[in-house]
């Protein structure tokens, strides 16, 4: 899978910055050198610079404000633009099926959690990764637009994911 590193880095950066997460920052920052596309590599480098320039408390507070206290920008993709809980349930089942179809099951997370979906796409073949990313693309675009509107740097990470997915399919993002 040509975009495995990019997907894993994006998944990592969207995860809650726990103590284990902070311990992994140096290794993940070093992995940025393996990103092939220069524009994507630059986004990751700048994001890791942002992390290094923030105190741990500041970064964690910003993360919580961005994703835990906002319905507009939370990381559970089926909650965006959803007032029909029946349709939301159907989407959750479709996302769950993406995991099951690829031999994975989630035990501690909902299947619409962005980092989990990115990790799944990184662990499968390119054609399966493209299928997964195409399935969630409208939700990724909506979340990216909301992150841009909220002036959050995480929008650039979704730009990378969407650009890399487009590269797999031969499109331009």
For the regions a protein language model found, what residue spans apply to each?
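Charged, alpha-helix-forming regions
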Residues: 1-112, 119-173
């Amino acid at each position: 899978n040509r975009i495995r590193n990019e997907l894993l880095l994006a998944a990592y950066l969207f995860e809650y910055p726990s103590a284990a997460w902070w311990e992994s920052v140096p290794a993940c920052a070093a992995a940025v050198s393996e990103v092939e596309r220069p524009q994507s590599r630059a986004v990751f480098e700048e994001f890791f610079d942002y992390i290094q320039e923030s105190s741990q408390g500041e970064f964690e507070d910003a993360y919580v404000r961005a994703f835990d206290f906002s319905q507009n920008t939370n990381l559970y993709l089926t909650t965006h633009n959803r007032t029909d809980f029946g349709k939301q349930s159907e989407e959750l089942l479709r996302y769950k099926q993406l995991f099951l179809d690829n031999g994975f099951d989630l035990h501690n997370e909902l299947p619409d959690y962005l980092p989990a979906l990115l990790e799944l796409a990184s662990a499968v073949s390119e054609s399966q990764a493209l299928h997964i990313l195409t399935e969630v693309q409208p939700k990724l675009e909506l979340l990216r637009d909301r992150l841009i509107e909220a002036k959050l740097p995480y929008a650039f990470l979704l730009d990378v994911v969407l650009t890399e997915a487009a590269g797999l399919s031969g499109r331009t993002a």
